[in-house]
Amino acid sequence: MNEVNDFDAIRISLASPDQIRSWSYGEVTKPETINYRTLKPERDGLFCERIFGPIKDFECACGKYKRIRYKGIICDKCGVEIARAKVRRERMGHIELACPVGHIWFTRGIPSRVGLLLNLSTRSLERIIYYSHFIITAVNDEARAKAIKDLEVISSQRVADKGSEVDTRVAQMEAEDATVEAINQIRRDFSTEREQMEEDIQLLIDQLKDLQKGNLLTENQYYELKQRFSNVFEASMGAEALLKLLSYIDMDKERSKLIQETRSTSGQRRKKAGKQLQLVEAFRRSSNKPEWMIMTVLPVLPPDLRPMVQLDGGRFATSDLNDLYRRVINRNNRLQHLMEIGAPEIIIRNEKRMLQEAVDSLIDNGRRGKSVAVNGDHKAKSLSDLLRGKQGRFRQNLLGKRVDYSGRSVIVVGPSLKLSQCGLPRRMALELFKPFVMHRLVRDGLAPNIKSARRLVERARPEVYDILEEVVKDRPVLLNRAPTLHRLSIQAFEPVLIDGSALRLHPLVCSAFNADFDGDQMAVHVPLSKAAVKEARETMLSIHNMMLPSSGEPVVSPSLDMVFGCYYLTTTRPGAKGEGKIFGDFEEAKRYYEMGIIDLRAIIKVRDGKGNMLETTTGRIIFNDVLPKAVEFQNMDIPKSAIKKIIGRCYKILSSQDMAVMLDKIKELGFKFATSSGISIAMSDISVPREKTKLVAAADERTAIAEGQFARGLITEDERYNSIIETWMETTDRITDAIQAGFDKQGSVYMMANSGAKGNISQIRQMAGLRGLMTNPSGRIIDFPIKSSLREGLTALEYFISTHGARKGLADTALRTSGSGYLTRRLIDVTQDVIILQEDCGTANGTWIIEPKEKGMLPPLVDRILGRWTAHNVVHPQTGEIIVDNNEEIDEIKAKAIGEAGITEVFVRSPLTCESTHGMCRRCYGRDLGRVRLVDMNTAVGIIAAQSIGEPGTQLTLRTFHTGGVVGVDITTGLPRVEELFEARPPKVQSIISEIDGVVEVIENENGRHIRIASDEVYQDEYELPSGWKTQVQSRQWVDSGMVLASPELEGKSKAVVQSDQNVVARVAGEVTIEGNLITIKYSESEEREYTIPAAMQIKVKTGDTIRAGQQLTDGSINPQDILSILGRDAVQKYLVEEVQKVYYSQGVHINDKHIEVIARQMLIKVRIDSSGDTDLVPGELVDKFRYEDINAKVLAEGGEPATAHTVLMGITRASLSTESWLAAASFQETTRVLTDAAIYGRVDKLSGLKENVIIGKLIPAQCKSCKEATIERAERIAAAASAPAMSGLPENCL
């Protein structure tokens, strides 16, 4: 028998009425739910046991059959099948609707699918469906022709009759000798009357001719026409009419008609025909029928999915769906009754409209008109509301499940723990591991059965704790700190049982979790299965997660006290006890320190292991003892940055276990010496520099001059403002320099800031110098500086100005965190199916990585190429020696060699150019930065990329808070810029760019400012003459197109005429150059573009400049869509990567280019079809680039005409919604729209991404290579590194 879960794709499509009836176990005919006295479901009601199954396991409604032995029997008395009660979660019912009803998803969507198919506007459709207008459903052409003929006969008959009547009257008048005037008047009246009669008949004929299927008629028009021409046409209203029209559609004919229309029309009409064609193709390819968008049978959800529960006061709480179903059933029953008794048409029509509205409310309440409310103001939750939004079924229950075997507690620091350990409170561990402890108690014979084992555990006997110790030995636990921004926010640890109620966390993993000990809480999860335990131990243990996946930097680097302790340990103190003493080796120096003869930081001389005399300190000797032998003696002050570099270097030469031991030793050293340093901070440590008074007075003077010039009208408001800001910024910098110059290098404040433990020079300047300029809530700098320092105290006015900045910091924190989280969610969605699925895609393409022109704006070339694979040989520019072969990894040594060779650009493999049709290949991605090796197969690199970009987004957001609102770059400018780029939106301040290469001319006149770009491209056309041909033109001669340039030379004196088609003729007009047998015509083509420049924009070019296409003409940011249309795909990819990188790098956040490239690849993965050729593709359709190439290749192989298309740059939201997986798209945004489209197209989800597998409860298709499998590779690397030169010989970026 096939397993229920054994499937590899899910299809969604429209349900036919027959299919709905086949799902159903019976028709629900009554609106009742349960009997309020017996509390039993009413028969044929919404909770009927006969339809949906018994309420109690294996017990029918009347109680005749009880127990499992009657399973499957249907009670002859109450009609209930004997089964488990859980069938009430699966069994559906149905309602037979008295008249067809439109499904609101298909009638009211944008665009309305029914409207598009029938060529009706949404407004017209609404008029029909809600019974306000009639629509013609059929026209009898024969009857129409006959009616027209009859009308013409009647018309001529009437005219003839009237004519003879007039003739008789005229004859009579002539006999009575009437005046000529009177007779003429009668004739004139007849002429007018005849014209009126003909006009009336023509009007009726025109009305008949205008009757077309699908035309709308008002009620008056309908009755008027029906009275006269009842046999010519049929018209009706409501969903019934739409059902008829939809069932008449012949999809093949419609397709041919629309294809013709897309080829023969243009503009809006072509666009609409393209959309209609896509819809027709969708119905043709899927097995759906268009009439299924109109419902004649309504499915009823199983009752346990819309439960009704009794509350304490005898009242009932019920799902809103029951109320919505009740309304539908009531109206349906009433309509059936009215139709049976033959009620007037108007009453029936009104009841049909009410039924349509009831079904609309059930499916999607509030989409049309006023939403139905239950219990006063509470809006009823419809079926669509159950799916959409954060509380909907997708995001609340399918993607965010609750987890058992988990706990939560406050965290405290555990300085004595090993790196791979965490402290788990005994009581918590006992609850978490209860089943394991109970099993062990029974197995070891300490309890006879599980029940008594549970009692032992609940009484917490001493033997229970002994067994608990054994259980936790081989079971790691997962710790998670919310918000889970990247994969390092969940790590595995070996639990150590402790007393108390708080979790203990190793201090070195705090930065990975972004945790501190001010009341943070963390969750604990227990991996249950063997596979889960194996994965936790081999890939999730904290010792396997020491590097940041975003940049490859160490994440387990010491901080705060530990940094200060190591810095204090390695600094020198001039004049300290024992200074200048000489020792034979390190051990002797340490013994003297332990005996108290020399000071820890005294400068001494010692012979190292190689016999060289070193000038160092005992502290540095102690510090170097914990480092591996392969690392050269570190004879310098060790601040935070140096520790990071040392850890990065050691990671490459030590195993995970040795690395963990070394880190624990550094941690212990740091804590020990931070304690013995006796560091403290007092008011006396902060001294205001003497130069401050003079500098502030000079700045006041310059400010007064600027104010005076402004008062006299010599400068503008902007110039005054800029002058004041510049003055105070300069002054602030000078005061900062003065503070630095006057620092006590042995002082606590200086050491704290210099070591990188806490604080920076900006904060010290605010304490000792002056607070400086502040920003107001809008981000504008206030031109009134705070001249006091925090040491001196602020005046009342200064205090209130400073609160501006502080408040802005707090407000930004609250507002921007959500923005960053939403950006992360969109990034995750767009990349969730990017997984490493191929070893090598074999592409020869790549991307150029170029040394940035502006240092500090982008990372240096050496950092950007590290860990990438080359797409071309990297050759030394001077010697020609190959530094890196094609298709080889650039490691640290090769990267250093490239830097030293002065190479400024390298062609590397990139995710942007990877040709894997699904996911990505290992070579194009390169090194996994978190593991420092080539990325493993099945790694979810898309998720890693999204986390790497999103996690620092939140960090940047929160960073405003820590600077206390002092003037500086605020993420308010950074995060929206990143969002703008990833959403491919036009920038707020959009720069004008040139569409062509050419020479600039800036024009300024009364009509404003214009820039004209003129391009004169010189081309040449060459003609090679066979020998013996004679030229008919001279060099430098101007020739016109079509002029003869050369002809065959005739032999002898023959008079034969040369045929004109034998001559060489000029294809273009231009100037001739003749060189031997080669004639060249030089000609130029000129092109001009003119751009109007808005007054507020600053021009970046000047007259006479030569510029390239895509170059900026004005200030601002370039619209990525413009770059795509002018310079193409590669240029826009490069622009996106560099612009995003600039935002992060300027904030001091390091993200590897490849993460941004993964996102950019997803933004450009679709193409829009321009012409379909001989393929089944539809013009205007969005198709995956690789699928498009595949289809074209097949068509070309068969000798057909391929389709044409252009690349589309989509924002991450649009890209997520147009993903191949409808499950992933529906769980992201616009759930109902995605499901509507997917159902019509009959989409198949192949379950290739992560989200769709999580939704249906399968394992995700991403398994990393376990660390055990990687140990052999690592051992080889460590052996190679051990024989490598010592630390000083390695490049800076590998430290």
From Swiss-Prot:
Binds 1 Mg(2+) ion per subunit. Binds 2 Zn(2+) ions per subunit. One of its GO terms (cellular component) is DNA-directed RNA polymerase complex. Its cofactor is Mg(2+); Zn(2+). Keywords: DNA-directed RNA polymerase, Magnesium, Metal-binding, Nucleotidyltransferase, Transcription, Transferase, Zinc. It catalyses: RNA(n) + a ribonucleoside 5'-triphosphate = RNA(n+1) + diphosphate. Mg(2+) binds at residues 516, 518, 520. Zn(2+) 1 binds at residues 60, 62, 75, 78. Belongs to the RNA polymerase beta' chain family. The RNAP catalytic core consists of 2 alpha, 1 beta, 1 beta' and 1 omega subunit. When a sigma factor is associated with the core the holoenzyme is formed, which can initiate transcription. HAMAP family: RNApol_bact_RpoC. DNA-dependent RNA polymerase catalyzes the transcription of DNA into RNA using the four ribonucleoside triphosphates as substrates. This is DNA-directed RNA polymerase subunit beta'. It comes from Dehalococcoides mccartyi (strain ATCC BAA-2100 / JCM 16839 / KCTC 5957 / BAV1).
